[in-house]
Amino acid sequence: GCGAAATAIEKRDLVVQTKMSDSIFLEPVSSQKQIVYVKVRNTTDKDIEIEDQIKRAFELKGFKVVSNPDEAYFMIQANVLQVGKTDATDSDSALKSGFGGGLLGAGVSMATGGSGNNIGIGAAIGAVAGLLADTMVKDIYYSMVTDVEIRQRPAINEKIVQSEENYSDQGTSSTISQNVNTNDVQWKIYRTRVISTANQVNLQFEEAKAELSKGIAKSLSGLL
C-alpha cells in the first residue's frame, strides 16, 4: 500500500552509521611511536573477518602494525559480540549500555499492512494487493556490536594507578579508574562499545556485513 511505497522511496539508499558509547582521547605521539598491535575476536555465529581491515586502515594512516604486543605503543583489542537483524531502538539501547553491557534484542523493523474488511470484491482485491506490496517492502536494519579495549603506553615519568571492579552477574562489565601516581603500570586502558548499523529497504545480510565491517574498521582506526 501507500506505506510500502513511502518506505521504498525513503529507504532506497543504504545508510550506515557507526557510533561509540564513550569518547576516548589518547595522547598524541611522535611518528616513531606510531606502532600498534591489533587483535580482534569474533564470538558470534557469523563469518566475520575485520581484523585485516582494521590493520590496513592503520597502515594507511602511517602506523606500523606489529604481531608482538611487547613492541607496540598502542594496543587495540576488540570482540565482535553480535551481528544480525535489529531495529533502531535496540541499537540505541545496546550502545547506551556501553562496554560489557546488554546486547541487541530480536526486533526487526519492517513495513507491514493489513487486509481490508469484507466489504466488497473491489475492496478485498485492493486490500490483498496492498498486503502483498507491504510484505515485499521491508525496512531492514542490521547491526554489529563490538566491545573495544584500547591501551597506550604511559609517557616518560608518568605513573599510573589502575583498579578494576567487575559488577555484572556475568563478570563482563567493568569500570576502570586511573590516577597519575606512583605505581608502575604498563598500559593506560580505555574501553568503549562500537555499534555499526546499516539500514535499507530489503537489505541483504551479505551486503550489510561488508559495510558494517568497514564502519567498525574506520571507527577504530580513527581513535589513534
Tell where the protein language model's regions lie, with residue ranges.
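Short, low-complexity, glycine-enriched hydrophobic/amphipathic alpha-helices that associate
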Residues: T86-I140
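Membrane-engaging insertion elements
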Residues: E10-V15, G120-E164
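Intrinsically disordered, low-complexity segments enriched in small/polar residues
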Residues: G1, L103-G105, D169
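Acidic, Ser/Thr-rich low-complexity segments on the non-lumenal side of membrane proteins
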Residues: E165-I176
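A general secondary-structure signal for short beta-strands and their flanking turns/coil
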Residues: Y73, D139-V145, W187-I189
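A structural "domain/chain start" motif
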Residues: C2-E71, Q77-G100, I160-Q162, S177-K214, ...
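Long, contiguous hydrophobic alpha-helical segments, chiefly transmembrane helices and signal peptides
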Residues: F58, I76-A78, Y142-V148
